[in-house]
């Protein structure tokens, strides 16, 4: 079943991360773009999936990149002609554009008689604010994708799992939808809109949970579930929405008016249709390739603070 937005089929990006896998991940035939974040390229390759693009600092990948096309510009290893301007490290290159990342229309069949383009890769520095996963999502967004199916984004390192939850909230705020696939469960985030689930044989205790990702989420509706609510307000300090249940052969709808909510549901559930009132942002921001400007510089900042007259104690204040 295809994911739809207001009756349309939006451009879908499938991302392979370097987190935990559970044995049932596979290629999405309807994905317009497939991107691997660093070591996710190994997981994709082990399942016979060829990404359009591999991005990251390459601290976890083992896949041979000799056949990949290097987009360059960020790793310090790539060179450019003497006297030529250095590549813009923050913007996706023209090679990352939608026209350069074409996918088969279905597995085993391409959209043209030509062979698929070789996998491209873009190396990023290790010291940067964005995770490799967020870089992959940003590039997918630049390629026109608004729905993201992410493998390897749950489990493994807890800090990365938490970062990925923040990331799918970012996508929701920008007018898109990203889903993290786990062990029999999918986690997604939505804002100012709703998810609609078709009737299905849910069986007993087919759990669906709703939690606020923002400080406050308002106008929450849960219809067609065991516990139904209308116009509820949740905060991110409440756990009220945990462990609701699908009802067998009953359509369900989950939505909200303001804020962002997380929704978790079984991967056996039908793919929900999705509506949002948010006009998609043109960008999720430039690729981050440098350490945060907020970082202190050990030693130097301390000296500057001690010698700065504006920070010296006022005479007689002690």
What label would you give each PLM region?
Residues 1-73:
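N-terminal beta-strand-loop-alpha-helix module at the start
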Residues 183, 190-318:
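Long, charged alpha-helical interface segments
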Residues 158-169:
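Short Gly/Thr/Asp-enriched flexible loops that form oxyanion-binding sites at enzyme active sites
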Residues 170-187:
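Short, acidic/small-residue loops that bind anionic groups at enzyme active sites
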